[in-house]
Amino acid sequence: MISVNDFRTGLTIEVDGGIWRVVDFQHVKPGKGAAFVRSKLRNLRTGAIQEKTFRAGEKVAKAQIETKTMQYLYANGDQHVFMDTSSYEQLELSATQIEEELKYLLENMSVHIMMYQDETLGIELPNTVELKVVETEPGIKGDTASGGTKPAKTETGLVVNVPFFVNEGDTLVVNTSDGSYVSRA
């Protein structure tokens, strides 16, 4: 059991029969009345986000999530195949299970598969990934004075707003938490 006062972003808990990851939290101490913790939780089974308020000091069960390092091999229709790098076992996940992560996945990429009591909950991506630009408008000389951006389509289909100096064929470093441009690789 863990106190809600010890909430941290990324913590995994069991509440109301579900497995939830803390996305955001805020300790609130009103002038009148008892303190409480307002939290935003993501259901790891369904991907749904829910806001929940806990009384300060309330205890919740911490979910024991096991992670395995696996390599993304290929897409087989609606199924995506991953291989355990130590035992060479293969695991298939449906596109609906990893819908948000698909736009960052490249073949042979290492990811962490989240498991809870032999149930696969989803995948955990690295903080940044390198993606190649396949389509973007050419930058026009002198456009950089405004510091603007333009859309660029990557090899996975993700559209990222990039500075004008980025061209087709460039490799970008992209933040996986919000899909934003970090730098050129």
Curated annotation (Swiss-Prot):
One GO process term, biological-process aspect: peptide biosynthetic process
Keyword annotations of the record: Cytoplasm, Elongation factor, Protein biosynthesis
Annotated metabolic or biological route of this protein: Protein biosynthesis; polypeptide chain elongation
CDD domains (UniProt xref): S1_EF-P_repeat_1, S1_EF-P_repeat_2
Consequence of gene loss (knockout): No sporulation at 37 or 47 degrees Celsius.
Localization in the cell: Cytoplasm
Function: Involved in peptide bond synthesis. Stimulates efficient translation and peptide-bond synthesis on native or reconstituted 70S ribosomes in vitro. Probably functions indirectly by altering the affinity of the ribosome for aminoacyl-tRNA, thus increasing their reactivity as acceptors for peptidyl transferase.
Name the record gives this protein: Elongation factor P
Organism: Bacillus subtilis (strain 168)
Name of encoding gene: efp
